[in-house]
C-alpha cells in the first residue's frame, strides 16, 4: 500500500480547474530528486481503500462507463504477469468517500471532447494508459545521465536487455509479452471537439474572420500530421513493479514537447519494425565553442537513447550543450525509394548521421559593388535597396528569432576598371601603385571597405542605418574621394581633378579574392582561439546571377583551401534564377587536343580519359598536342541562393518572370509606349520537309531534346567513334565558340616572345601596354589587315560630376541614322576592301571581327524562298553575348575595345548606363529590336536586311548535319577569317550584321548588298535570325559521359590523338575515376546528373543534408546557423586509384603503459589501453578536420564487401572493410579498422589481431599541379581608419605533404613523446594586469592585524591565481603531485632590466630547474632557535637566502615568506600542511628569530614580503658578512651608504632603480658578474639626438659578447600540464599545457599561454571564468590577448590593421635625460621613448605588456617557451587596464599603433557587446584628441620631465645613515641560544 497521498499541487494548467500533477508520494524515478506520481488506483482514486474484498461502487460505475465507450477488457493473462478481469482496479476494496481525492476521469471530463478509441479495438498492439509526469534531476541522456561515473569507452557489454529509459511503466500495464529493449510509442488519442455553435463563433462567422490557428507543440512543428510521425518512441527500460498498471510516467519536458496532458489517457503502441524508429539524421543547434571530437563523443553518448525535437542534450556534466532541431528518417515509398521525412522523435544508433549547426560562428558578409548594384530590378527597386531593405533586415530578424550570437564582419568589395586615358591620368599624378591587369590587359584596382568588424550585437537591426549610409557613400569614395585625397596631398590644381574609373560587371568581380582574404586569418584558426564561437561562415551578396569569370590558378587554389578547411561559401544572388546551372565559374585552360587513350590491359579496348582541366598544367604534363579552351566549373563548395523577393507583388505561379534582361533597352524608354510589337526572330528550320500536322507535347519535347543534343553531344560522339575530326572534310569540322578571355590568352601566347610597344616609357608606371586583344586583331586574322589607324580621342569624363549619365530615348532621327550608317559602311566596304585593312582596332569593323560573335546561320535557301520579312542584323559595336541557352542574347554597349573583352563570359544582363560620369553613350541595341520600332521611328520603311561584309569561316553554323554549337555556356565568339580548304568554288552567303555609328559625318542612307564567301554554303537572301542549328546526333549515353570531364568543353574542334607513356595514361584514367567528372547540360541538368556532379567534389558535405536540394531557394538554415563539416563521409578510392594517385606508408603504435601518458586517463588505460588509445587517435584526427569513412548511406546491407585500397599481410588482414556504423561500431567490437579522410589524406587505424599495437596506414595524394602562391594587392579601408589604404596579401596552397606529423601525434598519445611543437595545436594567451579598480571587500581579504597597501593586494591576487592553477596540476593516479608547483619570482624591475640582476637570475634558474628540499627527518618541536637558524643557513637546503633588490633598495641575506613556509613543510616531519607551517613561522617571528626587512609586517607567506634573520643569528650566513651593509643601495659607496629612492615616474614606477645607475658610477662593477667588457664613453656627452643618447646610455650596461662567445640564454617561463577536469565530468583526459612567466612585476602584465589538443573547450572556459572572478577580487583583470604583436595583424588579415596615432608635437630632446632619470631612480633607466611611455602609463592607464626585443641587453638571449624562435616584438606593447585595447609605441612623431582587443570586444557579455565597442572607440578618440593637440602635449612633456640633479640637496648617503641609525636603536636584545621552540 502506498502511503496516504499528500500532493503538492503544481501550477495548474490553463485548461483545467485544478492541478493533476501529484508530487512526492510515488516511487523515486531514476536520476530524480522528486518522487514520481503516486500509485493511485484509478478506479478508487476518489475513495479510501480498506481490506474488504467486495465489489466496489467504483467498479460498477466504471464498468458502465467502459461499456458506453466500448473499451475492451483484458480477457487473457500473460505468461509473465497475472492479469485480472476487472477494469481498471483490483477486486478488493471497501470504499470510504474522500472528497479531497482527485476525480476519476469520465466521459464528460475529457476537455469536453469525445474519446476516439476505435483504433484500440483493431489489435492488441496498443493500449490506453493514464499519463503522469515527473521532473528528472538531469537530462538522462548520454554521459549526462551519470556525471559522476561517465562511460569511458563504448562497450558492447552494456546490458542490452535493460537500456536506460526516461519512461517509467509497469510491465503489467501492457497486454502483450514484453522484455527490456522493446520499442514502444506514445501517441495522443484523437479527441474530436463537439461542433456546437456559440455566440462567439457566430460573430466570427458573420465578420468573416478565420478562427485563430492553434499552435502545435514544439516537437510537432514542421512534422506532417496523420502520417504516424508525431509520436514519442522509446526503448522499454527495466520493469517498475511499484508503478500503477494503469499509468505511464514520462518527464515533464517530454509531455510539454508533445502536448501530453497530465492524467489524460494516451495510446501506447508496440513497434514491430525497429528500423522504422531509428533516426537517420539528427540536426543539433549549439551556441559555444564545440570541437569536432566533442561532436563525435556527444553522438556516441546518445546511442540507444530517444531524442525528440526541441530536446536539450549535454555532455561532460553540461559542459557541452546542444538542442535537437529536427529528426529525419528515410521512409520508403510504394516504389521502394527511400525519401527523407521529418519525425518528432527517434532512437539514435551508430548509423545515425549528426548535423551540427553553430549559432555562434564568425560570419563574413561580403557585399559586391558593381555596375548592376545601382541598377533597377523589374519591380522598380534597385539592387542596393534590396540589400539594405530586403535581405539584411530579413537575415537579422531570423538571427534574432533563433537567438544567435554571431561575431559579424561586413565588407563591401568592388573592382574598378580604368581606360587607357585614365591610366595615363593616374600615371601622370603618380597614382598607379595598386593598378593590376586582367587577362585582357585591362587595368583595374580592387577596393575593400570594412563596414562592420568583429562585432557581436543583440540587435543587428540598429546597424542598418549605418550600413545604408556607407553604401550610399561608396560610389563617391571609390570613384572620386580616394584619388581626390591623393591629389590634394600633392597640391594638384582644381581643374586636374577628375572622376576616373568604371564599375565592373558582377561576373567580372573579385569574388575569389574576397573569399581568400577571409580565409587568410582562418588559416591559423587554432591561434588566439575564441572559446565562445565555432565555425566560419562566408556569404557573398551579389546582384549577379552566380556566374563569375575567374582565373584558373586562383580558382584551383581557392578550391584546395576550402576543401582543406572543410568549409563552404554561400552566394546570395539578388536576381532571378538564370536558365543555366549555378554556381558557375568560367576560366581558360590548356587541354589535350584529344582524349588520352588508355588501355586497361594487353589487347583491351582503348578508353578515352580526359583529365580534370582545373588541375591540368600543360608545362607539367607530357602531353604535347594541346590547345586553349573555355572551361566551366560547378564548384561543390558553393551554395547558391536567389533572393529575388518582390515586396509589392505577392508571388503567383502564373506570373511571368523575366530571366534575361537588356538594361540599356529598358532605360531607353521606348518600351514604355505601347505603340508597337516587339518581333522575336524565328527559330531556325531545317530544309528537310516536315509533316504538315500539329505538333504534340512529345513532339515538342523531342525537338527540344534534339536541340540540347546538338549543343552538348559533340565531344561524346567523337569519343565514341574514336576517330579524329581532322579525317573529315573541313566543312564538317565543328568550331568552338571562343570567349574574349580565350582570345586574350591565345594572344598572350603568341606575343609572349615579342616586345610590346611602349609609347611613353619602359615600365608600367609610365607606359601603356598593348592589349592582348589588339594583338589578336593584328595577328589572328588572315583576310583583314594588320595596320591600324590611331583611335580618335574619347571624350574626357566630366570633372567632379556625380550625376549618373542620362538615359534618353533615341529620337526617330537618331534611329534612322543608325540604319543609314550601317548601309553606307557596308557600301564602302564593298567598293573598297582595303578599308578593312586600314581600320583601327577599336573601329566598328575590327571590333565586329574580333569581338562580336555571329549567330548561327540558317540552312541555305534561295533568295525569295522565305515569305518572312527580313530582320535587321546585329550592330557591329554591340557585343552580343550568348547565354547558356542559345535562344537568349543580351547586348553590351557603351564599351571601349578593352571593355568588350570582359564580355567573354555569359551574363543575362546588358550593359547599364554609366554611373558617376556624363559621357555620350556609344552602345546601341540589336537590330531586330530596332526593326520592331521602325514603323514608329522612321519615315522610310525598308523591308530588307542591311548586311555587312565579314570574312567569316565559321563552320559551326548552318553547314550540314554536323553543325553543333559547342559551349554549354557559349561566350563571345572569335570570328577568325580563314581561307577555305574545302571545295574549289566557295559559295557566297549573307552574314547579318550592322555597323555601329561612325563619329564622322553620316552620308545619306542607301541600301546595299554585300556578298562574301563561305565554303560549302550558299545563300541568296537574308533569313530570320537563327537561334540554333538543327539537331545532328543523339544524346551521349551515361557511360560516355563518365569518360568526359565536366570541365572539358563539349566540342571537338581540332581534336587529335595524343600518345603518352603508359604511366601517364594510367594516372589520367585513375584521376578521372577518382575525381568523377561528368559532362552535363547546364541549361537542362537532370537530377541524376546534378547528384553525380555534386558527389564528384562535394563528398565531404554529403551528409550535411538528408538530401541535396536542386532548388536554389534561399538557404536560410545555412545563413542563420552555418553547418559544421559532417563527421562522416562515404568517399574511399579503390586499390587501383590508391596505387596510382597516392603515396602510402605504415607505422605502428605500441600499446604499453607509460609514465608520461597524459592524453589518456589512467583508469581507461588500465581497463583497455588499446581501445582507449584508438579512441583518442580518432578524436585527435577528427579535431584536425578528418572524417570517418562509412558505407554509403543507402547501402545498409551490401551484397558483397566493398573493395578496400589497402591490404596487409595475411595475419593482420582482418576486419579492414568499412562498416556502416563507423568508428563507434568498431570501438564497440574492439576489433577491425577505422577509416578516416581529410582533403588529400586517408588514414586507416587497425587493431592488430595478435599484438598489443595499432597499425596506422596513411595515404597522401600526389600533387601533379603547380602550387605557387598568388600575390594580391589592392586598397582596403579597415574599420576605424580614414580612407583607403594600400594592402597586399599572399594566397597560399595548403601544405599537402604532411601538414601535421601524425606519427608524432600518435606517439604523443601513447606517452613516448611529450612535445607539442611539430603539431598543429590550439593556443591562446592571457595576461593578468591591474584593473584600476578597488579590490572587492570580502572576509579574509586582509589578514588580521595587517595593513596591506594596493600594491600588496596586487601581489596577493597574483599569488592566489597561481595557487588556483596549482590545484589544476595533473596528478598521478594515486593522487600524489606529479609536478612542481607554479611559483613567482617577485621583482620591481621591468623585463629588460631584471635580466641584469644576477641574484634574481639565480633564483629564476632554481625555480625553473628545481632545487633541493629537506629530508623531513627532523622535528621542529623542541629545537633551539640557534639550531633552526643554523639549518636555515646551510647551503642547498631549499631555503634561498640572498641579496634582493626591492623598491630601489638592496636587502642582504633575505628570503620571502613563501619560501620559509615551504622550507618548514619540506624539512620537518611534524610540520604538516600549510596552516601548521604558518603557525610555526609566526612563532619563529614572535620569538625573535626572524623579522620583516622593514619591520612593517608580521609573518605572511607571500612571495613579495622579505624577511631576515635577526641578530645574532644572521652571522651564521657566513658568506654574507654584516660589513656589506644591511640595506645597501645601488648608489652606496660604503657599508652605510644607501638612501631611499624618491617616487618613481613610469608604469614601472615601483620598479627599482635601474642597474644603469650603478653603471654610471662604476660600469665595470655593474656588469662584472656578466663577464662583459664596457666601452667607455661618457653618456653625458650632450648629443642632441635623444635616440642616440639613449643608445649610448644603454651601451654602458649592455655589454657586447666577447669575440666568438655566445650570448647568455635565460629561460623566463615555466611549463606545466593542467588537468582541466579534476572532478571527472568528462569521459576522456582533458589536459592542457600551461606556459607562465616566472619573474613578475605587479605593475606590469603577467603572461599565461594555454596549449591544448582537442580538449572540451567548455572546461577551458570554466577555468578562465574562475580565474577572472578571482582576479577581480584583488583589483586585477584576467584578459585574453592575441599571441602575436598587433603590428603583424596585416600579415594575416589584409583588411585589418592597427590604427596609427601620430603626435602633433614630437617629444623634446633632453641631452641629460638619462642623468635625470638616474637621479629619480627611474625604473627602466632607458631614456628612449620615455615621454611616449609616460603618455600611455600616466595619462591613459595603460600597462606594459611586452617590451620591444631591442630593449634587452645585447649579451643576453631571453627565451619564452610560448614564443616561436626568432619572433621579435618590433615595438613595446601596452594593454589598457580595461583590456579593450592594445597599443604599441613607435616613438617620435609616429606616435603609436592602436588596435582594439578583438578577443575582449567581441566576447559575449551580459550587457551586450555594443557597450564594449563604444568604450573602445571612446578610449581611442580620447587618445587621438590628446595626441593631436600640440599645446596639451607640450604641457604634458614639462610635467613628466624629471628635474635636473642639484648638488645642494642632501645626499642619499645621509638619508640612509639616519634610517639605519634609527633601526639600530629599535633593535631588541638578541635572544639566548637556549631558547627552545
Swiss-Prot record:
It comes from Cryptococcus neoformans var. neoformans serotype D (strain JEC21 / ATCC MYA-565). Residues 764-779, 813-841, 1011-1023 have a biased composition (Polar residues). Belongs to the IML1 family. SUPFAM superfamilies: Winged helix' DNA-binding domain. It is found in: Vacuole membrane. It is a peripheral membrane protein. The gene is IML1. GO terms for molecular function: GTPase activator activity. This is Vacuolar membrane-associated protein IML1. It comes from the Eukaryota. The lineage of its organism: Eukaryota, Fungi, Dikarya, Basidiomycota, Agaricomycotina. GO terms for cellular component: GATOR1 complex; vacuolar membrane. Residues 1851-1868 have a biased composition (Acidic residues). The keyword Membrane applies. Residues 1-38, 195-214, 746-925, 956-1043, 1528-1548, 1566-1585, 1838-1877 are annotated as: Disordered. Keywords: Membrane, Vacuole. Residues 1435-1511 form the DEP domain. Its main location: membrane. Residues 797-812, 865-888, 988-1003 have a biased composition (Low complexity). GO terms for biological process: intracellular signal transduction; negative regulation of TORC1 signaling; positive regulation of autophagy. PANTHER family: DEP DOMAIN CONTAINING PROTEIN 5, GATOR COMPLEX PROTEIN DEPDC5. InterPro entries: DEP_dom, IML1, IML1_N, WH-like_DNA-bd_sf, WH_DNA-bd_sf.
